[in-house]
Design a protein with these regions (language model features):
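Cyclophilin-like peptidyl-prolyl cis-trans isomerases
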Residues: 2-13, 18-241
Length: 241
């Protein structure tokens, strides 16, 4: 796979299923949550990926019954996520480890699909500079980056209601999750998300959905990639009990 941004196939998939996705009164719904290229294309983790304590391979899972709180501060406000290890032990262990080591700090929400999802977490091409913006080269590739490793899939045992936080992945490629994640904006997204792929569910937004909605309402490219034109960075990401 090339390093260029891969066109999401959400609306194409919906059409192939013989149905038109209707979310929030809009037909089409934009692109599905999609990760970057396979880890096999990267010989080492991106040098800008957080701190030296970040994992370089799939970290230990969270145990069933173990929960964590991930707090994301952005210029738009604060988003608090309750992560539940019982939903997806492998994915939650990975997400919490990346949040704790600083990987997500300075990384943007790069895709905005109104009425559907917002997506972020590309630490390879989605990390802002000192000016709070992406470089021109990164802006052209944001959303196509990868972590340097991928993690195994977890089974999905619940559904994608508004506020659900889940891992993005490459369409039709099992075990392709890395660092990118998305937040569901609308209950109506659930059926189409399940039809398209199983995306490991990390937990749910416990506070700050108004902030998520505000980010989703910002301008995007208006094409199936739904790239944020002025992507919002995660200025601080911390983990608590």
């Amino acid at each position: 796979m090339s390093s260029s941004r891969r066109r999401p196939d959400w609306s194409l998939r919906a059409l192939a299923l013989g149905a038109t996705l209707i979310v929030g009164g809009c037909a089409g719904g934009g692109g599905l949550p999609i990760g970057g290229g396979p880890a096999a294309q990267v010989t080492s983790p991106p040098s800008s990926a957080g701190t030296s304590t970040c994992p370089t391979a799939q970290p230990a899972p969270l145990a069933a019954g173990q929960t964590k709180t991930v707090t994301i501060v952005t210029p738009q406000g604060t988003i608090v996520i309750k992560v539940d290890g019982g939903l997806a032990p492998i994915a939650t262990g990975n997400f919490v480890a990346l949040a704790a080591c600083g990987y997500y700090t300075g990384v943007v929400f790069s895709r905005l699909v109104p009425g559907f999802v917002i997506q972020g977490g590309d630490g390879q091409y989605g990390r802002v500079g000192a000016d709070g913006k992406l470089s021109a080269s990164d802006a052209a590739r944001v959303g196509s980056g990868n972590l340097g490793y991928t993690i195994a899939d977890d089974p999905v045992t619940t559904t994608y209601v508004r506020g659900t936080v889940a891992m993005a992945r490459i369409a039709d490629q099992p075990n392709s999750q890395g660092s990118q994640f998305f937040i569901v904006l609308n209950d109506a997204a659930a059926q189409s998300l399940i039809q398209a792929n199983d995306y490991a569910i990390l937990g749910k937004v416990s506070a700050g959905m108004d902030v998520v909605d505000a980010i989703a309402a910002l301008p995007n490219s208006g094409d199936p990639d739904n790239v944020a034109l002025n992507p919002v960075p995660m200025t601080s990401v911390t983990v608590g009990p």
